[in-house]
Amino acid sequence: MAPPPACRSPMSPPPPPLLLLLLSLALLGARARAEPAGSAVPAQSRPCVDCHAFEFMQRALQDLRKTACSLDARTETLLLQAERRALCACWPAGH
C-alpha cells in the first residue's frame, strides 16, 4: 500500500507557477491603481481643452442652424412650386 500523499504545511511556499501568477496579478493591480483611466490630460490644460470643445460645439450649432434655415427655405420653395403646378393644372388651357 502506498503512503498517503504528503500534505504541504500551511507555511510552505507555493509552487513557482502559482507564485508567478500571483506576482503578475499584484503588479497589474498596482499599475492599474497608479494610472487611472482618463487622466492623460493634465489638470492645468483641461480648461483650455474645454474652451476649445465649447467653441467647436458653438460653430457646429451655428452650421446646423444655417442648414436648417436653408432646408426650410428650400422646402417652402418646393411647396410653392407644387401648389403653382396644381393651380395651373386646374385652369383650362384655352383661357
UniProtKB/Swiss-Prot annotation:
Instruction: Tell me what this protein is called.
Output: NELL2-interacting cell ontogeny regulator 1
Can you tell me which family this protein belongs to?
Belongs to the NICOL family.
Cite the record's tissue specificity text.
Detected in the brain (at protein level). Also expressed at low levels in the kidney, primarily in tubular epithelial cells.
What keywords are annotated for this sequence in UniProt?
Answer: Cytoplasm, RNA-binding, Secreted, Signal
Any Pfam family from its record, for instance, is Neuropep_like
Assembly description: Interacts with NELL2; triggers epididymal differentiation. Interacts with cell surface receptor TFRC; the interaction mediates uptake of NICOL1 into fibroblasts.
Mainly localized where?
A: secreted
Q: Which organism is it from?
A: Homo sapiens
**Which Gene Ontology terms describe the biological processes this protein takes part in?**
3'-UTR-mediated mRNA stabilization; spermatogenesis
Q: Which residue ranges run through the membrane?
A: none
Signal peptide range equals 1-34
General function of this protein: mRNA-binding protein which interacts with a range of target mRNAs including SERPINE1, ACTA2, CCN2 and COL4A1 and may promote extracellular matrix production. Binds to the 3'-UTR of SERPINE1 mRNA and stabilizes the mRNA, possibly by competing for binding with SERBP1 and preventing SERBP1-mediated mRNA degradation. Also binds to the 3'-UTR of ACTA2. Testis-derived lumicrine factor that triggers epididymal differentiation and sperm maturation.
UniProt keyword Chloroplast, yes or no: no
Q: Name one GO cellular component term.
A: perinuclear region of cytoplasm
User: Entry's InterPro entries?
Assistant: NICOL
Instruction: State the compartments where it is located.
Output: Secreted; Cytoplasm, Perinuclear region
